[in-house]
């Protein structure tokens, strides 16, 4: 039986993951997921491709994005009610995110770990920084298969920052779900495509240091596969659209539906 074993969200894009006991999936994804993100002084996205150690900061927000708590690796905490400043548009991997600058102490606190001037943004539309299909899934058996080909004892699935982590399926069985509908908890998803991976997966999910060439290994045993535009990519896990909103919890079964 294939079932959900872990849920992961990032209230601030590229910062540490949270593992909630349940999520409410909407057509835009999970409203708390990637609700905030960082930009530089020119309004350009600052993520873990730029500063890997951002992952060392833990973040928490409420569904409305009205409060924000950041916990830093030195034990310090910055938290409070979110106040918004000027509107801002940000280029996010071929899309444009619309949001407002966040006033208050968070950006200054993040500068120390980022090593550069950054500004914090709250997106105007929950789920607005997700790439098209807001639900992402990967199985533990797929991650174990990657570890086998990489010649390491284990690979931490958090490298892939997937919303839904599964167990009980064969390695890369989720690939066969592309074009199919699946029931996950109370939600129904349509799996639309494999997930094209980037260099963030080469970073340790706790430190942000590059320590494993995941992309080379994926390409070596799976080859390059075309993305939605036909460009060859290293694919790992799948993306899905939310056809029926619903609640998802660890332990929920995953069922491939007819039609």
Regions found by a protein language model. Name each.
Residues 1-259:
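Metal-cofactor-dependent catalytic cores
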């Amino acid at each position: 039986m294939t079932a959900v074993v872990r849920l992961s969200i990032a209230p601030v894009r590229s910062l540490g993951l949270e593992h909630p006991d349940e999520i409410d999936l909407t057509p835009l994804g999970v409203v708390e997921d990637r609700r905030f993100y960082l930009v530089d002084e020119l309004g350009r996205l600052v993520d873990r491709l730029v500063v890997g150690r951002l992952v060392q900061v833990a973040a928490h927000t409420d569904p409305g994005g009205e409060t924000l708590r950041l916990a830093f690796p030195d034990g310090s905490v910055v938290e409070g009610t979110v106040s918004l400043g000027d509107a801002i548009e940000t280029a996010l991997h071929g899309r444009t995110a619309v949001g407002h600058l966040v006033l208050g102490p968070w950006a200054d606190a993040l500068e120390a770990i980022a090593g550069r001037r950054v500004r914090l943004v709250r997106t105007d539309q929950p789920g607005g920084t997700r790439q098209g299909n807001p639900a992402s899934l990967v199985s533990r058996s797929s991650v174990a298969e990657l570890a086998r080909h990489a010649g390491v004892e284990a690979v931490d699935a958090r490298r892939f920052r997937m919303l839904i982590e599964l167990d009980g399926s064969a390695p890369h069985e989720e690939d066969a779900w592309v074009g199919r509908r699946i029931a996950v908890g109370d939600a129904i998803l349509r799996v639309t495509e494999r997930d094209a991976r980037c260099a963030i997966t080469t970073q340790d999910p706790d430190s942000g240091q590059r320590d494993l060439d995941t992309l080379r290994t994926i390409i070596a045993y799976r080859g390059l596969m075309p993305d939605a535009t036909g460009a060859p990519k290293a694919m790992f896990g799948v993306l899905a659209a939310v056809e029926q909103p619903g609640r998802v919890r660890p332990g929920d079964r995953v069922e491939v539906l007819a039609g």
